[in-house]
Amino acid sequence: MQEMKIKLFTIQEVREFVNQVILVDFEVDLIQGRYTIDAKSIMGIFSLDLLSPITVVAHTDDASAFFKKISKFAA
């Protein structure tokens, strides 16, 4: 399990992020406070406070390629 902090400011960024998550073959969660949601859920992402950083949790031992693809969203 590996983690990274991100920020998503626009609807377009949320769509781009979800499109990257859909391509991986492992589970990815988003955590903010006490809420944990599936990173593939656009509606779930919009239920979070997008003004605050969000923790991305990749349930794999090697998420470096995935984190490189989403690095533009790094907080």
Residue ranges and their predicted role:
Residues 1-7:
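Short glycine-/aliphatic-rich beta-strand segments at the starts of folded cytosolic domains
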Residues 4, 26-28, 54:
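Conserved beta-strand core positions
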Residues 11-27, 35-50:
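Amphipathic alpha-helical interaction surfaces in cytosolic regulatory modules
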Residues 47-75:
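C-terminal structural segments of small proteins and small subunits
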